[in-house]
Every structure is written in C-alpha cells, then in structure tokens.
C-alpha cells in the first residue's frame, strides 16, 4: 500500500508532492492579482500523508518546510510559481523503525529533498473570480522530483477566500514505483501501492 503524503502545505509538491497545502492574498487593493511573493514555512504550510496498511491507516507528517510562492509575470495572475522543498528525513509516522525504512527506500542520504515547482494555475482560479464566488476548484501544473525521478504533475487545488487570507489545499495520489521508491512494507505489514499526498497553505491578503 502506498503512503498518502499529505501536503497539508497549510502549497507545495512538490509535491508533490506535493504535495504533499497554501493560501494566496492580494498585494494591492485590486482583485486581479495576488499578495506575492510569500514565503513557505511551517507557520503557514503543512504537508502530511496517510498510508493504508494491512492492519491500520498510517498518518505521517513533515516539518522544516521551505520555499516561496511568487508570480513569474506580475501581469499574469495564473503564472504562479510555487517552489517547495520537503526534507525526507523529517517524515514522521510516529514509529522510528518505520520512518527509517521509508527514508531508506527514498534514498534520503543521496536524495535528501522532495521538490515541487509549479508552472501554471488553471483559468477558473483567477483572483477576480474567487473574489466573487469565494472559492474555486482547479489545478496547478508543475514539476515534482522524488529521488532521481522528475515528472510533470497536475495538482488538484481548492482555493477559498477567508477574512484575511486565501487558503489553498489539495491531494495528489502517487504510485511508489513511478518514482523508483522500493516497497517500504515492513515484514508482514503491507502498504498500499498508492500514496495520497495532501497539502495546505495560507497566505495573507495583505502583508
């Protein structure tokens, strides 16, 4: 069974993962732009994962997230660049032996981070539209790198406007084998082959 990484980047994946939750605000008093750039860290972003196993559901978290959210083109509100990195050795499933096994399968010494760099937000999530509907469900296209594998992924995104921020979250299912990750199952405890990465992040409307 595979780990649902929960990019409660509360982005990216970077992804990835998340990949595996983020908010965006408006820098000026216009509804056609975001309040960017904005940093990504543990105070505004979280990445977590859920893994189904033979006997139970395994929940995991990450920490020491770092990165940023910016616009490639200030005139294009869809040109969002989420640059998120997750340290593999911060993965915590509340069981040291299991954490070590997972980190070994991900070759954490050789590939210490999981990264996600976004390229484009879907058209239906323009800030002008969100200001009217207060929310949107769209996608964020980007590049996810895990171990020695880099793939373009389409990250599901839900953006909601709150009193003083935009909250962004979503979940991305991944196959272990697609990223050259050996089956991290321990002894008779089997993990699902699909990992669901969830993220959430929040960025204030104003600095």
What are these regions, as identified by a protein language model?
Residues 2, 14, 35-37:
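Selective for proline/serine-rich intrinsically disordered segments
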Residues 27-207:
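Low-complexity, acidic/polar, glycine-enriched regions of mature
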Residues 12-23:
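Bacterial N-terminal signal peptides
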Residues 1-7:
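N-terminal secretory signal peptides that target proteins for export/translocation
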Residues 11-12, 31:
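Short stretches within intrinsically disordered, low-complexity N-terminal or propeptide regions
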